[in-house]
Amino acid sequence: MRAKDAIGAYGERVAGRWLEAEGLEVVERNWRCPDGELDLVARDGETLVFVEVKTRSSLAFGHPGEAVTRLKLARLRRLAARWLAEHDAHAREVRIDVVAVLRTRAGAARVEHLRGVG
């Protein structure tokens, strides 16, 4: 596994555990379709949450959350709509969150959950 893929997988594991500890239920991981991938899909009460996970091992290239651009948010909205259609899912509300994971040199993770970014 490439280093970039390994740190991404690490971040997604950390993010999933973080969300579950916060009371969300992760219902899908790494959902793929020809248009792209959703890292995590979760339920927060009656709200369906589409989660983009961004992981970095340093701040040299900025905060992980800064990597989610307007273009990326537009893609996430399209992917969320496709996921909802393909799963015939119904939710009172839908939201897009970002979980930013910074892996420190000591191997610990600093996690920031940004709710409703899209």
UniProtKB/Swiss-Prot annotation:
Coiled coil: none
Pfam families: UPF0102
Domain of life: Bacteria
SUPFAM superfamilies attached to this UniProt entry: Restriction endonuclease-like
CDD domains per UniProt: PoNe_Nuclease
InterPro entries: Restrct_endonuc-II-like (IPR011335), tRNA_endonuc-like_dom_sf (IPR011856), UPF0102_YraN-like (IPR003509)
GO-annotated molecular function: nucleic acid binding
NCBIfam families referenced in this protein's UniProt entry, alphabetically: PRK12497.1-3, PRK12497.3-3, YraN family protein
Family: Belongs to the UPF0102 family.
Name of the protein: UPF0102 protein Bcav_2532
UniProt organism field: Beutenbergia cavernae (strain ATCC BAA-8 / DSM 12333 / CCUG 43141 / JCM 11478 / NBRC 16432 / NCIMB 13614 / HKI 0122)
